[in-house]
A protein has these predicted regions:
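Hydrophobic alpha-helical hairpins/lids featuring a short glycine-rich hinge
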Residues: 76-127
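A generic local secondary-structure boundary/capping motif
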Residues: 6-8, 43-46, 70-76, 95-96, ...
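Short, acidic Gly/Pro/Ser/Thr-rich loop/turn segments
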Residues: 26, 63, 92-94
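N-terminal, positively charged regions that mediate nucleic acid binding
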Residues: 1-28, 32-39
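Conserved small/polar residues in nucleotide/adenosyl-binding loops
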Residues: 127-134
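A phosphate-binding glycine/aspartate-rich beta-alpha loop in the early core of alpha/beta enzymes
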Residues: 28-87
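Generic secondary-structure signature for well-ordered alpha-helical cores
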Residues: 9-16, 48-51, 90
């Protein structure tokens, strides 16, 4: 186990970490990296070894700026995961599904100057807005 400071330092250096959920939620580990440091190598690693959805966590404010709406008005999933409609970058991609295209989409979304005009909906990468843990762990 690492300290919170060590994890934050690793993320700032562009490294991936594994964050484990609470036992009362999904009780799983998630591969996590700083979105502004993502590249095709990280996307490839996540797709090959994580074998799940590659998602980007955004604040509610950022979702609003990008015009991201919830995938459904009535969230009936067990964990109430707040997925939005998926997106892709409007520029700099081809099919949108390659590791490079997904990294480009993530970088476009987290760009401080990004607007609704920066992205297209739907796209191949899933997004979710920021949700706070129900129990503080740090």
């Amino acid at each position: 186990m690492n300290t919170t400071k060590e994890i934050i330092d690793d993320l700032k250096e562009g490294k991936m970490v594994i964050i484990v959920d609470d036992e009362d939620r999904e009780n799983e580990g998630d591969l996590v990296c700083a979105a502004d440091k993502v590249g095709s190598d990280i996307i490839n690693f996540m797709a090959k070894h994580g074998r799940g959805l590659i998602c980007l966590t955004l604040t509610k404010k950022k979702c609003s700026v990008l015009g991201l709406k919830q995938m459904t008005d009535s969230n009936e999933s067990n964990n109430k995961t707040a997925f939005t409609v998926s997106i892709e970058a409007k520029e700099g991609i081809t099919t949108g599904i390659s590791a490079q295209d997904r990294a480009t989409t993530i970088l476009a979304a987290v760009n401080p100057d990004a607007t609704k005009k920066s992205i297209a909906q739907p796209g191949p990468v899933s997004y979710t807005h920021l949700t706070l843990p129900t129990k503080r762990i740090v």
